[in-house]
Amino acid sequence: CNLGGVVDEVDILECGYSLIAAEGARVVKIFREMYPNKPLLADLKIVDAGSKIGGMLLDGRPDFTTILCACEPGTITSVQAEAKKRGLNTKLQIELYGHWSFEDVKLWKELGISQLTLQHSGDKPGGWDEEEIATLKKLCDMGIDVAATGSIGYDDLEKFRGIPVSCFI
């Protein structure tokens, strides 16, 4: 997997859900070996079995990994423990998709989560709507880093003006 000159132009390399599902956690290790100095995201959206699944991903030494918002708090602490066991400073991102609440966000902050990713479903017709933009703003106002992902086109960028989105994925 040679990314050529593209690797110099992107801020973060992502081993996405589909890639990891198709090829296994080994792709995280491969990317890390090929690009040791580039920030790396392992985006498997862990929802359960944090020690096992998280451990497999963390063996590849990603800088970031995602946990789906539907998980139990124990999943978060299990992945955190696996990172600590490996001496890693991997940041865990909670991906907001489907059902979650602002009370959940408060709990995640208490558990040490400092990054969220707000997902616009690829199965939802159209781009980001006013409700999603308002949610994104409210999350940012809560003092947590929020990334925006899913169905973002060049023409959509104006909708995000004035909102301190940490990054677009």
Positions of predicted regions on the chain:
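Hydrophobic faces of well-ordered beta-strands that scaffold small-molecule active sites
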Residues: 1, 11-15, 40-44, 65-67, ...
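Conserved N-terminal beta1-alpha1 strand-loop-helix module at the mouth
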Residues: 1-42, 46-51, 59, 107
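Structural motif
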Residues: 8, 60, 111, 163-164
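Short beta->alpha linker loops
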Residues: 19, 23, 71-74, 100, ...
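Short glycine-enriched loops at secondary-structure junctions
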Residues: 44-48, 70-71, 153-154
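Conserved anion-binding
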Residues: 49-145
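A C-terminal functional module that forms or caps the active site or interfaces directly
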Residues: 133-163, 168
